[in-house]
Amino acid sequence: MAQTIDIANPTRTQAILNEYGLRAKKKFGQNFLTDLNVLHNIVEAAEITAEDYVIEIGPGIGALTEQLARSAKKVLAFEIDSQMVEVLADTLKPYDNVKVIENDVLKVDLAKVISEEFGDNAHVKIVANLPYYITTPILIQLLRSNINWDNIVVMMQREVADRLNAAVGTKSYGVLTLTIQYFAQATLAIKVPASSFNPSPNVDSAVVKLTPLKPTTVVENVGKLFGVIKGSFSHRRKSLWNNMLQTYGKDAGTKEQLTVALKSAQIDPAIRAERLNLEQFTQLYLALRDQNLTQ
């Protein structure tokens, strides 16, 4: 019976694509995972149990969703492509613990949806095979949301995975690195070759596991802290001082406030943002806040 064959089986994947006249859509960054070993390793990395509520982002034709449904209590899958939603209604028919929501996860009040679907105070695990072009904004939104999550296991481009734990002063170090450092610990779970997909992407992939961390220095407004960080990286080759002038203004009064803030935080204005660690950015934010400059 065809229905007993895993969706990720290469033959069945191709049959589904043929049946619905599907092609991977570049605008949605679609590549279909056809390596069952990788899928099993993703579920294992997420430590999915029969008591777990799972959020999946970008289910595609349901290859990963199927494996999650076999292990989890309930799976809530967000799919932006209406054509894929139609396919999922068929491929996931055997699983009554899966609900597919046709929406862009970046435009959803995830905390509200989780409360409605899983109940108040539910802890969730988030699993995703993310389109590479949108990996960073989705990760940042998830980490900065107020949802309770036990872990996040995400497939991403290997180059992006390397940025998560990039060292201070390196080319890969930036806003994403600092966001991860503030909220989570990132570990490389699986390396995934391009041959694991249909069609094969032009880059290798990696599965990364994020586990929540308590910040070493808690600030009262995380959004403003990362506003400072983002502004500091607005032009990587410019000095911190020049980026701050562009962000806060160039009038004499503002320059004086910036000078006081930098001195208070003990930061050289000529330094580039990539040379500052999270603690230094935190101190800079607090100093700018004291000068009423945080936006």
From Swiss-Prot:
Broad EC category: transferase
Chemical reaction(s) catalysed: adenosine(1518)/adenosine(1519) in 16S rRNA + 4 S-adenosyl-L-methionine = N(6)-dimethyladenosine(1518)/N(6)-dimethyladenosine(1519) in 16S rRNA + 4 S-adenosyl-L-homocysteine + 4 H(+)
Segments traversing the membrane: none
An example Gene Ontology CC term for this record: cytosol
Gene Ontology molecular-function annotations: 16S rRNA (adenine(1518)-N(6)/adenine(1519)-N(6))-dimethyltransferase activity; RNA binding
Location relative to the cell: Cytoplasm
Domain of life per record: Bacteria
Keyword list, A-Z: Cytoplasm, Methyltransferase, RNA-binding, rRNA processing, S-adenosyl-L-methionine, Transferase
Signal peptide start and end residues: none
InterPro entries per UniProt: KsgA/Erm, rRNA_Ade_diMease-like_C, rRNA_Ade_Mease_Trfase_CS, rRNA_Ade_methylase_Trfase_N, rRNA_adenine_dimethylase, SAM-dependent_MTases_sf
One Pfam family here: RrnaAD
Keyword RNA-binding applies: yes
EC number: 2.1.1.182
Residues where S-adenosyl-L-methionine binds: N31, L33, G58, E79, D104, N129
Family from the record: Belongs to the class I-like SAM-binding methyltransferase superfamily. rRNA adenine N(6)-methyltransferase family. RsmA subfamily.
PANTHER family named among the record's database cross-references: DIMETHYLADENOSINE TRANSFERASE, DIMETHYLADENOSINE TRANSFERASE-RELATED
Role this protein plays: Specifically dimethylates two adjacent adenosines (A1518 and A1519) in the loop of a conserved hairpin near the 3'-end of 16S rRNA in the 30S particle. May play a critical role in biogenesis of 30S subunits.
Name this protein carries in UniProt: Ribosomal RNA small subunit methyltransferase A
Species: Leuconostoc mesenteroides subsp. mesenteroides (strain ATCC 8293 / DSM 20343 / BCRC 11652 / CCM 1803 / JCM 6124 / NCDO 523 / NBRC 100496 / NCIMB 8023 / NCTC 12954 / NRRL B-1118 / 37Y)
